[in-house]
A protein has these predicted regions:
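Extended, aromatic/histidine-rich regions of cofactor-dependent oxidoreductases associated
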Residues: 3-93, 99-102, 115-116, 163-398
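Stable alpha-helical elements in mature extracytoplasmic
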Residues: 91, 107, 122, 154-157, ...
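Hydrophobic/aromatic pocket-lining and membrane-interface residues
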Residues: 95, 126, 158, 364
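Short, conserved helix/loop micro-motifs enriched in His/Cys and acidic residues
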Residues: 117-147
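Mid-length scaffold segments of soluble, non-membrane domains
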Residues: 148-154
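A mature extracytoplasmic/lumenal domain signature
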Residues: 97-99, 110, 128-130, 180
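Short Gly/aromatic-enriched secondary-structure transition segments
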Residues: 106-116
Length: 398
């Protein structure tokens, strides 16, 4: 049974192929974090359209309020314009490479039935989330706040699959490829790698379910890689090939793209891919998002009002969320919500004082269990990554 029906495939093609054939990526004019242009992909609710071809759509702020982000509103991110129509009956996951002792091929049924099941809640965040808020502007998809979501991912542990294939002692990296392709032969295939220790970590999954349902087409069906705590660039969609190798993978999307200045951010290292100048982006930084009140909201004087939002990091977990309403002179701790695990986001809330009329600026910062805290200022980088500065929202009490 096709993951994407013929009608859906035709609709998707009609919406995107014409632009892709010209080698264009059209970005809406209101792209600097604005939420004005909404469009619906087949099977999705209306999302904020950031690019037409390849499809890049972000989740509206209102849909980031629930504890789990719904499948129909989860953001969509593609690097290549030819979106695969995967047929699960014929899909196979191939595992091999020079450091694989027993190469294998698995059908979806075999993947589901041959290994212990595993589930975890985790934030999937595009590396460039909030790029559209950078000043000066930097190239790339101009995401606002919604190139992320929190979901319950279910599947099998990658390490169990790798062990079945036999991991040789010289294994250095594991390389992943998916079924999406490019229009032009010269366009580099989207292929990523992980260091062997991260690939063998018990939290790294091959998922075929999202929030208790089969993985949606636009989010990687029938199976995708889940790398909790690391940015979404490693979460390979429509997974088809896994290669275990004794050398550093030198593909474009590792050696040239998704890189940050070496030493600029306190994140996990990817030693085999580092140079003196740059290193691959890896973990997410401690961060937060205010979901209520919305920017420029008008609150009624004397009536109850609640600050609410989400906080997350790269996997140590959230220790506290602090709120300031006096120009950051003093901070109060918000109440944290349910703990879904160290890779999931954590809800927070705090009653707001609406006794006085006038403008109100609310600042929020999260603190991780490892002691990291959101900084006051953005660490500028040319790729537009890691915007985790203190979050603010300005409202009016009337």
């Amino acid at each position: 049974m096709p993951v994407l029906t013929r009608r859906e495939a035709l609709l998707a093609a009609a919406g995107f192929i014409a632009a892709g054939a010209r080698g264009e990526e059209k970005v809406p004019a209101a792209s600097g974090g604005g939420d004005t242009l909404l469009a619906a992909l087949p099977g999705k609710n209306p999302l904020i359209q950031r690019a037409f071809r390849p499809p890049n759509f972000e989740t509206p702020l209102a849909d980031l309020v629930p504890l789990y982000t719904g499948n129909a509103v989860f953001f969509v991110r593609y690097h290549l314009p030819v979106i695969p129509q995967v047929v699960t009956a014929s899909w196979q996951l191939r595992v091999g490479g020079p450091s694989a002792q027993r190469p294998l091929a698995l059908s979806l049924h075999e993947l589901k039935s041959s290994f212990p099941s595993a589930s975890l809640a985790a934030v999937n965040q595009c590396s460039g989330n909030r790029r559209g808020l950078f000043s000066p502007r930097v190239p790339g998809v101009q995401w606002g706040n919604g190139a992320m979501g929190n979901a319950l991912w279910s599947g099998v542990r990658l390490r169990d699959v790798l062990h079945k294939a036999g991991v040789a002692a010289d294994a250095l990296e594991v390389v992943f490829n998916g079924a999406d392709t490019s229009v032009l032969p010269a366009t580099p295939d989207f292929v990523k790698s992980l260091p062997i220790d991260r690939a063998l970590d018990e939290s790294t999954l091959i998922a075929f379910e999202m929030n208790g349902q089969p993985l949606p087409h636009w989010n990687g069906a029938p199976a995708r890689l889940i790398v909790p705590g690391w940015t979404g660039t490693y979460w390979m969609k429509h997974l088809t090939d896994i290669r275990i190798q004794p050398t550093a993978f030198d593909g474009f999307w590792m050696k040239s793209a998704y890189r940050i200045p070496t030493g600029a951010f306190p994140t996990a290292r990817f030693v085999s891919q580092e140079t003196p100048e740059t290193t691959p982006i890896t973990e997410m930084l401690v961060n937060s998002l205010i979901t209520s009140p919305a920017p420029a909201a008008r609150l009624r004087r004397g009536e109850p009002a609640q600050l609410a939002g989400k906080a997350w990091d790269g996997g140590s977990g959230i220790a506290a969320v602090e709120v300031s309403v006096d120009g950051r002179q003093s901070w109060r701790e918000a109440t944290l919500g349910r703990d879904l695990g160290r890779f999931a986001w954590r809800e927070f809330q705090l009653p707001l004082d609406t006794s006085s009329a006038g403008p109100l600026e609310i600042a929020v910062r999260a603190r991780s269990r490892n002691g990291a805290i959101q900084p006051e200022a953005l660490t500028f980088n040319a790729a537009g990554y890691h915007d985790n500065r203190v979050q603010t929202v300005r409202v009016e009490v009337t």
